């Protein structure tokens, strides 16, 4: 019985002490944006993506085109339309993947 309890205790301790492996989504998002030549503050860019998801969830934007325009309007002046769409795609994939069909529909 003591061995069983010791074994259970060891397993429990291992599970408690094991650090969960959580990726930093904001950092992953920033790294992807850099591939597209989009720079800026990590927190600000993540905020834009999260607000974009919220706007879609609340029905403020109902199409990907409306969301891309919102994103474009928030980014620096020299941002291209293509970059806004790339930003939108990355944002939807990382922060609200349930909205990806909107992007895939091209609306």
Language-model features, listed with the residues they occupy:
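Hydrophobic alpha-helical elements and their junctions with loops/disorder across both membrane
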Residues: 14-17, 56, 98
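Classic N-terminal secretory signal peptides
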Residues: 1-23
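Mitochondrial intermembrane space
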Residues: 13, 19, 34, 104-107
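Short N-proximal segments of mature Sec-exported proteins
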Residues: 24-74, 85-90, 94
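Short, low-complexity, Pro/Ser/Thr/Gly-rich segments in the mature regions of secreted, periplasmic
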Residues: 95-107
């Amino acid at each position: 019985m003591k061995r069983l309890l010791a074994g259970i205790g060891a397993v429990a301790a291992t599970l408690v002490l094991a650090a969960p492996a959580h990726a930093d989504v904001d950092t992953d998002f920033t790294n992807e944006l850099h591939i597209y030549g989009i720079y800026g503050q990590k927190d600000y860019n993540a905020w834009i993506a999260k607000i974009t998801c919220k706007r879609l969830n609340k029905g403020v934007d109902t199409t990907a085109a409306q969301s891309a325009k919102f994103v474009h309007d928030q980014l620096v002046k020299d941002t291209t339309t293509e970059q806004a769409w790339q930003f939108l795609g990355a944002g939807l994939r990382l922060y609200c993947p349930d909205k990806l069909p909107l992007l895939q529909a091209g609306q």
